[in-house]
Amino acid sequence: MSKDRMVELLQEHFELNLYEARAYVALVAFGVLTPAELASVSEVPAPRTYDVLRSLEKKGFAMTQPGKTNKYRPVHPANVLEKFIQDWQERVKEELEAKKKAKEELLELMAPLIETEVPKYGVERVWVVRGIKNSTLKTKEMLEEAQNEILLADDGFIAVNLEDDIIKAVDRGVKTKILLTKNLLPRLKASKIIDYAKEGKLELRALDKFDLPMLICDEEVFFALEDLAARYFNYETQVWIKDHRVVALFKEKFNEYWEKAEKV
């Protein structure tokens, strides 16, 4: 029913509870109601009507009509809903600014902890990362911190979704080689990666397929463990290693793929 849908929308998007939403719909339908009348035409329990109507008035959805009997009329939906959205936008804007300031303050406060040369619980050289969100954050971190070299063998995520981070690294002067599976090329047709390859700012090649996708940034390597079920549910397990010996082994594999690949 349309009434149920109206109640649902008011609850979901305009911060009214169930009884408030039902009461407001009834007010819009009937125009002016006393608490007793509201109880008879809506599904708001009689003992709750006074509190519900006062709450609607406080939230700006209803107004009291002067007289001997308490009567309430609705504020026009176009007015109250637009006002709600404007207030919400302002509130979100303020919250966003507050979060940005908090982020900057936290980064400033944590800088000494990050930059300290004292090892914390030993030198961590191996991390296991699970889930697409965490993997994306780690990949972005590696691309942002790369100074000399990026070697990327990608079969479906990084080049398409983290193009800006790759381009920024190239613009910083990081030497970059990207190896893609050929099925990705149509998705990158209009990307800066293709443009940069044509301009010689990075090297780009393609293969039909390869068994071991990887990202190497300087002395770090990041790769996924083979688990088709986990990949289906976006919960792949990936491993990050910082060890020049391990990186050398992965570079050998990357170069093996690179030699077989076609220039794009």
From Swiss-Prot:
Keywords recorded for this protein, A-Z: DNA-binding, Transcription, Transcription regulation
Q: Which GO terms describe its molecular function?
A: DNA binding
Coiled-coil spans are none
Q: Specify the superkingdom.
A: Archaea
Which InterPro entries does the annotation name?
HTH-type_TrmB_regulator (IPR053499), TrmB-like (IPR051797), Tscrpt_reg_TrmB_C (IPR021586), Tscrpt_reg_TrmB_N (IPR002831), WH-like_DNA-bd_sf (IPR036388), WH_DNA-bd_sf (IPR036390)
Instruction: Write down the DNA-binding region ranges.
Output: 33-54
Instruction: Describe the function of this protein.
Output: Binds to the maltodextrin transport gene cluster (mdxE operon) promoter and to some other TGM (Thermococcales-Glycolytic-Motif) sequences, but not exclusively.
Written domain comment of the UniProt record: Lacks the C-terminal sugar-binding domain.
Tell me its family.
Answer: Belongs to the transcriptional regulator TrmB family.
Q: What is this protein called?
A: Putative HTH-type transcriptional regulator TrmBL2
Q: Which source organism? A: Pyrococcus furiosus (strain ATCC 43587 / DSM 3638 / JCM 8422 / Vc1)
Q: Upper taxonomic classification of the species?
A: Archaea, Methanobacteriati, Methanobacteriota, Thermococci, Thermococcales
